[in-house]
Regions:
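Conserved, well-structured interaction surfaces
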Residues: 11-84, 114, 132-135
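Hydrophobic-face positions in mid-chain alpha helices that act as interaction patches
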Residues: 165-235
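Short coil/turn linking the two alpha-helices of tandem helical-hairpin repeats
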Residues: 82-89, 138, 157-160
Length: 235
């Protein structure tokens, strides 16, 4: 996301400048903590899935929705991990090349890296579960449409064109989203575009909140900020 147009402006951080310029290294904080942060999120998702019996008065519908939301998070995190720390899908004919460790239990002994085929199989299983058991609209939380959006992208990378098209058309034909009227998301002459401005009618699933203030990322022509790490400045 740091290298795409999902950004706003401005303020300062050499950390994000390094990402924008593709000059990251082991000591770049933003990338250095990603591996651990994704597994923290996966761990918490697994804890939720394994802890329902500890909650009194939890009805079946709520339990199913929470499990689906948790498995959505687990799938998305595993997907970003395998994209960043493994050769891409299709690098070997059967995708037997090493991916990343799979974590589907809250407490598990250290395990070797699963193959890319195994990681993608788990991702698809979790997203299909989320798609089947989440509502099409779910407020700020994961939804069935969000699961279809990720499935469309993942099937595209797998070169399963028909499956990718089916998931994309499901989202498009839902009537819940529409293309943004203005492709210029950065107001000319504006000093700041807040993260909230980047959630628009075409957003299927987005995260804009965070504890950080807006951060500058430089290119030769403009100053921008990553939306996922911006919060409105105090008045």
């Amino acid at each position: 996301e740091l290298l795409t147009d999902n950004m706003a402006r401005p303020y300062s951080s050499l950390d994000y400048t390094a990402v924008w310029n593709r000059e990251t290294n082991f000591f770049t904080p933003t990338t250095g903590g990603l591996y651990t942060d994704f597994y923290y999120a996966i761990y918490r998702a697994n804890v939720v899935v394994e802890s329902f019996d500890l909650v009194e008065g939890l009805d079946d519908a709520t339990r199913l929705r929470l499990e689906a939301e948790s498995r959505f998070v687990r799938a998305v995190c595993h997907w970003y991990l395998v994209k960043m720390w493994a050769y891409p899908y299709g690098y070997t004919a059967d995708n037997s090349h090493l991916g990343v460790p799979l974590r589907t239990d809250a407490v598990a002994p250290p395990s070797p890296r699963a193959t890319v085929a195994e990681v993608y199989a788990q991702i698809l299983e979790d997203l299909e579960f989320a798609k089947a058991n989440l509502p099409n609209e779910n407020g700020p939380y994961a939804s069935s449409m969000a699961a279809s959006g990720f499935l469309a992208h993942i099937h595209f990378l797998r070169q399963d064109w028909s499956a990718s098209r089916a998931e994309a058309e499901r989202v498009i034909n839902s009537g819940l989203f529409q293309l943004d009227d203005d492709l210029d998301r950065y107001e000319a002459g504006s000093d700041s575009v807040l993260a909230g401005d980047l959630i628009n009618p075409e957003t299927v699933f987005g995260i804009t909140g965070g504890h950080q203030t807006p951060i500058r990322v430089f290119d030769p022509d403009k100053i921008v900020v990553v939306a996922d790490h911006t919060v409105p400045a105090p008045s």
